[in-house]
Regions:
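Metal-dependent phosphodiesterase/nuclease catalytic metal-binding core
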Residues: 1, 96-415, 422, 432-437, ...
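Pre-active-site segment of Zn-dependent metallo-hydrolases
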Residues: 1-58, 68-83, 186-192, 196-197, ...
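Structured loop/turn residues at beta-strand edges in well-structured enzyme cores
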Residues: 24-27, 262, 466-469, 506, ...
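Residue-level recognition of the N-termini of beta-strands and the immediately preceding loop/turn
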Residues: 29-30, 58-61, 86, 265, ...
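Short internal beta-strands
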Residues: 59-67, 268-271, 292-300, 504-515
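A glycine-rich helix N-cap at a beta->alpha junction
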Residues: 80-94, 528-542
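Eukaryotic, compositionally biased intrinsically disordered regions
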Residues: 450, 455, 516-517, 535-546
Length: 576
């Protein structure tokens, strides 16, 4: 944040939900910088673009490796940006830099070595005929609301553009700022109000009528030469040797002769946690000034965050609902810092949590005062203090105690991970329902943004890995963004879980409109390989007269009719 602008580095799933909860002003976001084009970095971009458009921002510029624009091409039928111009700066271009009234930024592309080269596909095949379906025409009542798209075929070679694999480091230097004129010092030195103040403020020494010389340095605070901060990511070991030997980054290290002005105050690391512990990476970090603050934001290789998802609201409402039924609304097993735990703010290597703040100008350094802290008793007391709540709660408990179960079946079990909220907010996520058909056999109905995170938040990492490894199918009724934009993150999270649990689970059965192919294949060829993680069954194949049910599925699934959109395929699910 600055007084003039806000700059966003990476934009993972759940970004707009956190922005809404913590009152982050998206109206000031016009520049977004990406350290690597992985889903963990770009998964929140489609959703946050819609939010930025809604608050009236006319333009945003994406800085990163080539191919970022493909994300919006692939999503153009369900991410409708009529009033937002999205620009892309190829940060791998050696002539590219960024500069505005606040700072100058240099881009440092870092390529993997040959061992990190992505495998070539067997053939050069078209991704898919571009999807020109207007998914919003029925509800908006006007097909012209969505610009017509020219039907094309998007061709991709088996190899990605080599530059699209680049990781980006950003060296950011704030512009110098003159010291502030201190009025009390002017009075102390006998400077009368008037034009002489302006001369001193401009850095000019003056002579008073009595012949006394007053130096500008006597009455101004010191000039700020412009602090440096660096944002980096080393995605995996195939980048490591090139990363630690990158000359422009080494020039910033104290051990290599960097001056006080060039030494970064802060180094922000999006590097995976395990890789930051590699001896080469640790040695590289040790080259910076001893006072540099290393802010660690990376995930583990299993997709885990260092600590917490940063939302107090989900814990607050879960503690309050827990009062109604402790089994249906169990306490969440996540480990945000609980009230009373000590802060750890002295280490130069800091495991960052949401709202960790470092002030560069004026240089106040680290501030942890805004970091979310769980206060369970406060949330309970908040509910109990409501007029009439205790009496209503007691009546509910008595009613439940006398209730007769309508079934003794243990399954199916449903967990509502999201509801019909088309835009995520602090207490509601977008559409997703997890169904446990029998013990440790799951399917998912819809997969809105942040669904993977909701599963981890509800079950905790260990149990979530088991659940995801035993997830056999996902059903997506239609291609509104709030019903499927979390699918890529879920596919990757499931694969991490399979590897973690050493499961022999095969590809996920994906039941969805066939048009989803354009989105998924474009992502597969332009960003990361994901096609091996799923098998697509088109919803059209479930209609009566074709394939009434999927006999190989964990449940009997058939289609029904719907009026939500012309392309919606509702589902009738019958447990075996």
């Amino acid at each position: 944040f600055t007084d003039q602008s806000c700059y966003l580095f990476n934009c993972g799933e759940g970004s707009q939900r956190l922005a809404h909860e913590h009152r982050f002003k998206l109206s000031k976001v016009e520049q977004i910088f990406f350290t690597h084009t992985s889903w963990g970095n770009v998964g929140g971009l489609p959703g946050i673009s819609l939010t930025i458009q809604d608050v009236g921002v006319p333009n945003i510029t994406l800085h990163g490796a080539p191919g970022l624009g493909d994300l919006f091409v692939a999503a153009s039928r369900f991410i409708i940006l009529k009033d937002l111009q999205v620009n892309h700066i190829d940060a791998t271009n050696p002539e590219s830099t960024f500069e505005d009234a606040v700072m100058k930024m240099n881009y440092i592309p870092i390529m993997p070595d040959e061992t990190g080269k992505l495998p070539r596909s067997a053939t050069n095949s078209p991704i898919e005929e571009e999807d020109v379906t207007n998914y919003y025409s029925r509800e908006k009542g006007n097909p012209e609301d969505v610009p017509a798209a020219k039907r094309t075929r998007v061709e991709k070679n088996g190899d990605m553009n080599p530059s699209s694999k680049a990781a980006l480091a950003y060296i950011c230097r704030l512009h110098p700022k003159q010291g502030m004129l201190m009025a009390e010092k002017c009075v102390e030195f006998g400077v009368p109000p008037g034009p002489l103040y302006g001369q001193l403020k401009a850095g000019q020494d003056i002579t008073l009528p009595n012949g006394k010389t007053v130096l500008a340095s006597d009455v101004r605070s010191p000039d700020d030469p412009g602090p440096v901060f660096v944002v980096v990511e080393c995605p995996d070991e195939s980048y490591l040797d090139n990363f630690v030997s990158e000359p422009q980054l080494r020039k910033l290290q104290r051990r290599n002769g960097a001056t006080e002005l060039d030494c970064p105050k802060v180094v922000v690391h999006f590097t995976p946690i395990e890789l930051t512990r590699h001896p080469k990476y640790q040695e590289w970090m040790g080259g910076f000034d001893a006072d540099a603050c290393h802010m660690m934001l990376g995930f583990t290789k299993d997709g885990e965050e260092r600590r917490g998802f940063g939302s107090l609201a989900v814990h607050r409402i879960q503690h309050q609902l827990h009062l109604l039924d402790s089994e249906i609304f169990p306490h969440l097993p996540f480990d945000l810092r609980v009230d009373g735990e000590p802060e750890h703010s002295e280490a130069s290597e800091l495991d960052c949590q949401t709202l960790t703040t470092y002030y560069l100008r004026p240089l106040k350094k680290l501030d942890l005062s805004l970091v979310p802290i769980l206060k369970p008793q406060e949330y309970v007391d908040e509910s109990l203090s409501q007029e009439g709540f205790k009496l209503s709660l007691e009546a509910l408990k008595l009613t439940l105690a006398d209730a007769v179960p309508i079934s003794n079946k243990a399954y199916p079990k449903l967990v509502f991970l999201g509801t019909g909220s088309c835009i995520p907010n602090k207490t509601r996520n977008t559409s997703a329902i997890l169904v446990e058909l029998e013990k440790d056999r799951f399917i998912l109905m819809d997969c809105g943004e942040g669904t993977y995170g909701q599963i981890v938040r509800f079950f905790g990492h260990e149990r979530a890995a088991q659940v995801l490894s035993n997830l056999v199918g996902v059903y997506i009724s239609h291609l509104h963004a709030d019903h499927h934009i979390g699918l890529i993150g879920l596919l990757q999270g499931r694969q991490h879980s399979i590897e973690r649990t050493k499961s022999d689970a095969g590809p996920l059965m994906l039941i969805a409109p066939h048009q989803i192919n354009f989105w998924l294949k474009t992502y597969h060829y332009s960003f990361e390989r994901i096609r091996q993680y799923y098998t697509l069954v088109a919803c059209a194949n479930l209609f009566e007269g074709k394939t009434p049910t999927l006999r190989s599925s964990p449940a009997l699934i058939s289609n029904q009719s719907s009026l939500h959109t012309s392309d919606t395929a509702p589902m009738h699910l019958a447990s075996r």
